[in-house]
Amino acid sequence: MNNEHRFEIDGITYLMTPANAMAAWQSLKRAGVLLRGMDADALTNTQGAASVALGAILSHLGDPAVTEIEALVFEQTAIKTPDGTTYRLSPDRLNEHFNTRRTHLLRVLMEGVKYQYSDFFAGGMAAFQELIPMPSAEKQ
C-alpha cells in the first residue's frame, strides 16, 4: 500500500493515508457478506476484485457495513483548499465540506475504497474465499 493517495477535484486536493490494517480488515469482513453471490471468477485478479467489491458496496449504500467503510475512508482523508486551508474530513466537517461539493462525495468514496481495501485482495483471494465461499468456487 502506498503511504498516501493524492488526487484533485475542482482545485481541492484530497490526501488519503492508510487506515489501521486491523480496523480496515474488520470493516471489510463485515461488508464481506455483501459479496455473497458474486462470481468468484470476476474476483481472480486485484483490479477485478476491487471493481466487483466496489460495485457491491455502492449497490448497498445505507447498509451499516457500508456506513462503517464510509466512516473509515472519510476519517483517513485530509483536504487542502486552493487558499491553503487544510483539515481532516472528520464527522463534524463532512456536511460543511460536501454541502458545497456534492459532486465530490462519490468520487472521494470510490477512491478511498480502492485505496484502503484493494491491497487486501492482492494475492489473498483464496483466503477471502475461505472466509466467504463464492458460488463458482464451490462448483470446483
UniProtKB/Swiss-Prot annotation:
A Pfam family that the UniProt record links to this protein: Phage_TAC_9
Superkingdom, taxonomy of origin: Bacteria
InterPro entries reported in the protein's UniProt record: Phage_TAC_9 (IPR020351)
Protein name according to UniProt: Uncharacterized protein PD_1186
Source organism: Xylella fastidiosa (strain Temecula1 / ATCC 700964)
